[in-house]
Structures are given as C-alpha cells and as structure tokens.
C-alpha cells in the first residue's frame, strides 16, 4: 500500500497568520521555529521519568523528543512519507509538559480540576505553540504540525493506527481521543511509544531499580535486552507490517512482547516505591507554588509594581512574565484560571525547586534583590 494523505495539502500547510514561505519549506520552517523557541530549550532540564539531576546519562525530556524525531524520520523514509513534517511534530509534541514528568502533569491537572479545568500535556503543547511562545504571538505553525502535536497521545499503545483525515478545529479539542489528520502524525504517535519503552527500562537498570535478569523472557527474545535493540526491532517490524495492513502497525508476536514490556515497566518502574517517594516532594513543590502565585495574582492582578511587596525573585519574575504577556491575557476577558498554570508548567525542574527556596527561605540583607525591583 502507498500511504497518501486524504486531505488537501493546502489545508495541511495553512498557517493561522499568512506568511511568505522561504527556501526551508513549510514543515522544516516549523522545525527551526520550534528549535529556536524557549520552551524547547527548557526541555533539557525537565524530567522524562526519572528525576536524576546528578546523572548525565538518564533520559531527559529533550532527549526523548529527539528519539521520537529520529524514529519518526526513519519510519517516514521507509514508508515514503514527509520526513520534515514528522520532525516538526516530534520536536513540538512535548513542549507543554510540566516539570517533573507525568507526575507533574497529574498534579497540575488536579489543581485545575478544583477550578473546573484540566491540564493535559497534549492539549497544552498546542497552547504553547499557538499562544505562549513569543509573548502571546505563538510560532504560527502549519495546521499539519499543530494537529500532530495535539493528537500525539503517547500513553495508549494500539497495535494498529490510522489517521482520521479530518480538518478539525484544534482549539476546541478538550479531551484525548482525537486521531491525527495525517499519516505522519500517526507515525509520530507510534514513535512516541517506541521511544520510551526500552529507554525507561534501560534507565531503570542504570539506577538499579531493576536488574537485567528481571526483564521478561518474551521481551528479551522478541525485542531485545537493550534500548537500541528494542528500537531496531520495532522500527523494522512497523516498516514491514504497515504496508500490508494499510495502517501504522505492529505484528502480533511483536505487539504481544511490547504489551508485556509495558506491563513490566508499569509494575516495576513507574509504580516503584522509590519513585513514589519523590512524587510526594513534587506534589508539595507544585502545590505550594500554585497557591502562592495564585494568591499573588488575586491580590495584585496586573499592577506589576505591587509584586515588589513580596520581596522575592519568584514574585518579581512572575510579574515580569505577566507584563510581557499582558496583551494576551487581557484579550481573554477574564478566565484567568490557566494563567498561573501557564507559568508553572513552563518551569524546569530546577527552576521549580529554586522558586520554592525563594518563598520559603529568606534572603540575607546583602542580597542583590533590590536591583530587580520593578519600577
């Protein structure tokens, strides 16, 4: 089967604000825009699964998205699809992730639920590229890339996936469940899963949470015992099976082994008591930051100078953020529930921890705080 998108290329290449294209082409331009953005740069200091700031060889969020990009590009080459589109979707798919990985996402989601909202990183990644980058202006990406970002949903591992080829109002998507409009987006959705299963297992071994001999036999035999072997097996399987199935798909034996590995990872890694101990710290950090910043905003609103009264760098930086984003939030006509979450979700792990210190530990009199006071 030849994979072709049943949706007009002009729709896929459409931007919310018309612009003259250049020699990079539609989708490679999106790739460079994402790479140059601040949210992409911050991914190198955001947890993937393991909070391990002292170990340079444990996967961070930026390494994960690079794995997704290379896997997606390889599959697109094999299947005759648009590599540039897949690269852009891959690099942008996790820009909306919270600090401290999926645990941080759940914490922010619970905080927003109390105010009638939700925090879902797939949806939030679209908010980042559409609005939060460039002080409310966004990156002005193509429809195809925006669609692939919001529909990448990497948690459910389906054996076969097909695009819906629908032109959707992406801003109205409020829950998971939508499928990509393109084959390239579907490839990224599959590659997201391929990228994390073996790598999470390998990192867990390095951190001594599990041992090599703990890996189920069916996984070692059919997929491999190292991340590189697992990726190689899955990429080759998808490349050979997909044209026959008319879908981005895995064979039955490989899919069985994949689901075994996924169950193993959940039982022995993601729900490991050692990690659960860290989760309590992350909940205290993010909940405290949310409560403090929400209180500040409810007291001072957009009166930026009043944030000086708090006498800490977090409040001053938050005020500076509000000042730069004022036009965007002002045009929302209220509904500021997401405003504090926008700021916290953009934090790196280290910045969140430093911010807690700012509001919990007083500075000495010789500190340089005064030069940052907003005037």
Which residues make up each language-model segment?
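Short alpha-helix carrying the canonical HExxH Zn2+-binding catalytic motif
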Residues: 87-92, 96, 187-191
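Short active-site segment of divalent metal-dependent hydrolases/proteases
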Residues: 96-100, 195
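A glycine- and small-aliphatic-rich helix-loop capping segment at beta-alpha/alpha-beta transitions
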Residues: 101-114
């Amino acid at each position: 089967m030849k994979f072709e998108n049943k949706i007009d290329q002009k729709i896929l290449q459409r931007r919310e604000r018309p612009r003259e294209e250049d020699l990079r082409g539609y989708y490679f331009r999106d790739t460079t825009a994402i790479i140059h953005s601040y949210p992409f740069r911050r991914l190198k200091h955001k947890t993937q699964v393991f909070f391990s700031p002292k170990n340079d060889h444990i996967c961070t969020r930026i390494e994960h998205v690079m794995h997704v990009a290379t896997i997606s590009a390889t599959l697109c080459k094999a299947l005759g699809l648009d590599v540039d589109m897949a690269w852009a979707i891959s690099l942008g798919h996790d820009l909306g992730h919270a600090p401290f990985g999926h645990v941080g996402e759940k914490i922010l989601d619970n905080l927003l639920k109390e105010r009638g909202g939700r925090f879902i990183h797939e949806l939030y990644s679209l908010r980042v590229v559409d609005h939060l980058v460039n002080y409310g202006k966004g990156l002005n990406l193509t429809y195809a890339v925006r669609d692939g970002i919001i529909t990448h949903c990497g948690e459910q591992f389906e054996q076969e996936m097909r695009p819906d080829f629908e032109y959707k109002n992406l801003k109205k998507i409020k829950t998971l469940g939508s499928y990509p409009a393109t084959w390239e987006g579907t490839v990224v959705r599959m590659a997201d899963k391929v990228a994390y299963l073996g790598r999470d297992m390998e990192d867990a071994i390095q951190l001594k949470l599990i041992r090599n001999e703990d890996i189920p036999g069916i996984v070692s035999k059919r997929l491999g015992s190292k991340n590189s072997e697992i990726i190689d097996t899955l990429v080759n399987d998808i490349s050979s099976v997909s044209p026959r199935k008319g879908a981005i798909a895995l064979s039955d034996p490989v899919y069985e082994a994949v689901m075994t590995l996924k169950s193993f990872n959940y039982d022995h890694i993601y729900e490991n008591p050692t990690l659960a101990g860290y989760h309590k710290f992350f909940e205290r950090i993010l909940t405290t930051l949310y409560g403090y910043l929400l209180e500040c905003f409810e007291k001072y609103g957009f009166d930026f100078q009043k944030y000086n009264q708090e006498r800490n760098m977090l409040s001053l930086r938050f005020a500076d953020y509000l000042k730069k984003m004022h036009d965007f939030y002002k045009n929302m006509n209220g509904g500021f529930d997401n405003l504090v979450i926008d700021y916290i979700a953009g934090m790196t792990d280290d910045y969140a921890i430093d911010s807690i210190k700012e509001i919990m530990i007083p500075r000495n009199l010789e500190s340089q705080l005064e030069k940052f006071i907003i005037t």
